[in-house]
């Protein structure tokens, strides 16, 4: 597609140390008072899932340079600061064929979207104008908003401690620990709430395009660096953590940088490229096993969160529905886990070049034991 041109050469990055992350616990237990439910619970029905959805290519684009970027302010509440003159130039450059990451003609996309922030909407508008389509429809989705900073709102991005505290929660969520809080945030209090918010926006974009699609289709969404990178790393089947941490040293994503994913809400998502660097579809053995364990851990956390939300709402029907859905989701994750691990191991053996199947199996067993 037009938005995926030849690779750009990555800038050299400083040495970095990747901290080991322990995959502890398989879920979150919510301690809550018992709420009476009218009548007995219905029988729990387990449904089979058919993976037959059409794939979408989604280009997630960070906004152009904003006044907050220039002043070094963490601003995560809409409407936020506008873009600068340089930011407007960056947005217009997205329509230039000389840009290695230039976007396709607006008419190519099934939908063009932006968050509630001024900076994303201005970036989209300036690109559309430069592409000769100033009147092209632009849909606004609050789910695409920046990852909320909580108590860090308005603090300096140049303060390394503040920047680190802002990323503690998101980094934990990427490794399956959705329960870790985002300090002081009522918008994104934890990974479950953020997953629901941004994931619902992506699903809405998908549904809008899939309505009339007989085959694959594409959409573009203008969002923010932290929300784009966090949700993508939480959800894709082939997360490239080395590439992520290298980009983290440079601010995660540059202004108008892009992350491209492909897939659908039913079968899941694959990372295609990160800021112009293509990503292998097969994540490799260790990353594949990590994703299998991550998916197993996430299911009970999401179920527990939705049940807790229903309990707080106090509607017995909502509580019953949350229990039903949560049970089905956790059971599906537990049932799918053994086969997912087997598929990951056999896939790694098939892709291992120059080594025997026994060596590959030994590596797999060592990874599981470690």
Task: List where the protein language model places each region.
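Active-site-proximal alpha-helix that buttresses catalytic centers in soluble enzyme cores
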Residues: 55-140
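Composition-driven, intrinsically disordered low-complexity tracts enriched in small residues
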Residues: 1-61, 66-67, 105-106, 116, ...
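Short, well-ordered beta-to-alpha junction loops that form the rim of enzyme active sites
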Residues: 114-117, 143, 217-226
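Phosphate-handling substructures
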Residues: 130-200
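A structural signal for well-ordered alpha-helical segments within the folded catalytic domains
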Residues: 92, 118-122, 192, 196-199, ...
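Short acidic/His/Gly/Ser-rich catalytic and metal-binding motifs that mark active-site loops
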Residues: 66-71, 149-150, 230
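Charge-patterned, long linear interaction tracts outside catalytic cores
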Residues: 201-212, 219-224
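Active-site metal-coordination segments of metallo-dependent hydrolases
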Residues: 77-86, 117, 181-192, 250
